[in-house]
A protein has these predicted regions:
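Structured, charged N-terminal subsegments at the starts of enzyme catalytic cores
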Residues: 5-6, 10-16, 20
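Binding-interface segments
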Residues: 17, 21-201
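Short, Lys/Arg-enriched N-terminal segments with co-localized hydrophobic residues
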Residues: 1-2
Length: 201
């Protein structure tokens, strides 16, 4: 069995080399980030840096650009390293769907997902978040007080719910200290935000 494995490794030299490069690449990034910890960088207490980087690298191996070419071939190694470091310094994990890698013009970028944004917000005192859609025919009212948006009311009739008649959306964030924050976007703003994301048509 041992001989068979050795022969198999010898004939499959390229995949084996990829594994070695993978491990040394991740080890190098891990050491760089651990070195930065001496100068103030910190990670969440439940964050396993090497596991997150290895999981991200495995995800990158399966990720393709819009031309269906593997990202590890079409993107520069510097941009791949930077995207991995960006993910790690945010304390996020692609395996937990907290972000994803995208290729733009030969450059790999890490982009936070909705779950990544929620994870970061919770670290900074967010207790909960509630989101609602505003449809044509809804009665929605808010005011601004000391620079903060305050929700007054949102009355919605079941018959107003129609995906072709969405006027906007809002989110109410409840903080650990009991304060609330309101964010409101009209449909034009939402589409503009979508247009900056990967895969929007």
């Amino acid at each position: 069995i041992v001989m068979a494995n050795k022969t198999q490794l010898a004939t499959a030299g390229e995949p084996q080399a990829a594994v070695v490069i993978n491990n040394s690449f991740i080890d190098g990034l891990t050491k760089q980030l651990e070195e930065k910890c001496k100068y103030g960088l910190s990670f969440p207490k439940d964050y396993n840096l090497s596991n997150a980087l290895m999981g991200a690298y495995l995800t990158l191996k399966e990720t393709k650009d819009r031309n269906n070419k593997p990202v590890l071939e079409s993107c520069t190694s510097t941009s791949i390293a930077n995207s991995l470091m960006n993910m790690a310094t945010l304390g996020l994990s692609v395996q937990k769907k907290q972000g994803y890698f995208i290729a733009y013009g030969g450059q790999c970028q890490f982009q936070r997902s909705y779950f990544g944004n929620i994870t970061i917000a919770r670290r900074y005192g967010m207790k909960d978040i509630h989101t609602e859609i505003i449809y044509d025919g809804d009665k929605f009212k808010y005011h601004i007080e000391d620079g903060n948006k305050i929700l007054d009311s949102h009355e919605q009739d079941f018959m107003n719910i129609d995906n072709d008649k969405i006027l906007g959306a809002y989110a109410v964030v409840l903080m650990e200290d009991g304060t609330k924050h309101l964010e409101v976007m009209n449909m034009k703003q939402i589409k503009q935000a979508w247009s900056q994301g990967y895969g929007y048509k």
